């Protein structure tokens, strides 16, 4: 299980990304619009740089919803490979059966 501080840090990042998503998108649109004056675009870049680092979506890391494990994450189920195996063996995931050949 991941440290609680790491799980909370990731939750905080998710909140910040959601909070600043609209503002960040607006500033990016202004900064990348070549029809606008260069000075206005530069000011938008400066404002974008002043936003909190953790408000950027690229800083998010997928974590298992049950354990907080950051590696071997299955996006579709939002769990790690270990929990996928445990839940699958326990019959908690509909349609998943243990393979045999």
From Swiss-Prot:
GO terms for molecular function: rRNA binding; structural constituent of ribosome. GO terms for cellular component: cytoplasm; small ribosomal subunit. It comes from the Bacteria. Signal peptide: none annotated. InterPro entries: Ribosomal_uS14, Ribosomal_uS14_bac/plastid, Ribosomal_uS14_CS. GO terms for biological process: translation. Keywords: Ribonucleoprotein, Ribosomal protein, RNA-binding, rRNA-binding. Part of the 30S ribosomal subunit. Contacts proteins S3 and S10. Belongs to the universal ribosomal protein uS14 family. Binds 16S rRNA, required for the assembly of 30S particles and may also be responsible for determining the conformation of the 16S rRNA at the A site. This is Small ribosomal subunit protein uS14.
